[in-house]
Amino acid sequence: MARYEDLPYRTCVGMMLINREGLVFIGRRAGGIEHVDDTHVWQMPQGGVDPGEDTWEAAKRELYEETNVRSVEKIGEVPDWLIYDIPRTVAGRAWKGRYRGQRQKWFAVRFTGADSEIDVGAPGGHKPEFTGWRWEPMQNLPDLIVPFKRPVYERVVKEFSQLAVAV
């Protein structure tokens, strides 16, 4: 097995889905080895980029696969790739031990559909990644994510804070 320091980062996208009231979609994770407690189980949709796939196309695909949502318009993008390391204690089990963390390209989208479009139980025919969901004020997000992802969420919130307005 490769040393933790030598492992690459998984290329990934993240989506901040903002409704017409300026609130952000968060999903309650369906468990996982990084689970630390019942407060830090919420996150925004995110997922891997397939080889040769455009990041925006990957983001739309991941959003659909995790939430069933297609009714969106792109309203923002973090210009940089954001990186986080997973704790060494779970690195050997997460992603079959192939990565030390993720490098993420983040997008903000305005949700133009109705809440009834959201389905985390059988999203787009894929295995559910969330067991529930809710709309949350953007500034609360960093306190709801697993601690090792908090710096990324703080940066995403800072980048998109002006978008948390009712339209």
Curated annotation (Swiss-Prot):
Coiled coil: none annotated. Its cofactor is a divalent metal cation. Residues 8-158 form the Nudix hydrolase domain. The keyword Oxidoreductase does not apply. GO terms for biological process: nucleoside phosphate metabolic process; ribose phosphate metabolic process. InterPro entries: NUDIX_hydrolase-like_dom_sf, NUDIX_hydrolase_CS, NUDIX_hydrolase_dom, RppH. GO terms for molecular function: bis(5'-adenosyl)-pentaphosphatase activity; guanosine-3',5'-bis(diphosphate) 3'-diphosphatase activity. Transmembrane segments: none annotated. Pfam families: NUDIX. It comes from the Bacteria. It is an enzyme of class 3 (hydrolase). Its EC number is 3.6.1.-. A motif (Nudix box) lies at residues 47-68. Keywords: Hydrolase. HAMAP family: Nudix_RppH (MF_00298). Accelerates the degradation of transcripts by removing pyrophosphate from the 5'-end of triphosphorylated RNA, leading to a more labile monophosphorylated state that can stimulate subsequent ribonuclease cleavage. Belongs to the Nudix hydrolase family. RppH subfamily. This is RNA pyrophosphohydrolase. It comes from Rhodopseudomonas palustris (strain BisB5).
